[in-house]
Amino acid sequence: EETDGMERRSAQTALWLILDTMTKLFAPILAFTCDEIWQAMPHRGEEDGRNVILNEMNQPFADYALSPAEMEKWALVEDLRDDVNVVLENARNEKKIGKALEAHVVLYPQGDEGKQAMEKLSGFTTDQLADLFIVSDVEIAQGTGAAGVKVPGIQAAVSEAKGEKCERCWKHHIKVGADKEHPTLCPRCARVIRTIEL
């Protein structure tokens, strides 16, 4: 993503919070290793940068707590990802695809259960679902596919993704090569590279 892009900054923040917490947790056991990590990482203003042992253990981050509705939505995403992974594995076994990033996934909502599940997923774009499933493309359509085990209201099917492979993100996209400055990149990666080059 862009250097100051929200997704990139969010991922960096999450990774930093995990590193900060794990370094403090392991410090009594791996004192020298954790101290070396502590010396190399950035710190919050209230933390003592001299040694990891001189700092309080992190408390749960209330700012990042999810509401029950958000927890339910993410549980649904995890269950749906598990169902999609089963369909991907079957497609691999049938030699339809090699790797997950070569896949185009179609989700077929079925009946009221499917409609309710799709309403919970309405905050996600198909590009975000593709990122969560680690596939090239996701489409939502009418029809039938393999029945889900964990999310019975949504069926899924897999086919080979159309287009060329982007050499940066490895996703297959029909518009790889559309950007003359970056002929081997998909539009998203070409946009990101342009912002980095400025």
Report the location of each language-model feature.
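Short cysteine-rich clusters marking metal-coordination/redox-active sites
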Residues: C166, C186-C189
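Short glycine/threonine-rich loop-to-helix capping motif typified by GTGT followed
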Residues: Q110-T126
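Flanking scaffold residues of small Cys/His-coordinated metal-binding clusters
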Residues: A161-E164, E181
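Short linker/helix segments within small regulatory modules
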Residues: K175-T184
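A glycine-rich helix N-cap at a beta->alpha junction
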Residues: F124-I140
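Cys/His-coordinated zinc-binding microdomains
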Residues: A27, W170-H173, A190
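Short metal-binding segments enriched for Cys and/or His
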Residues: V192-L198
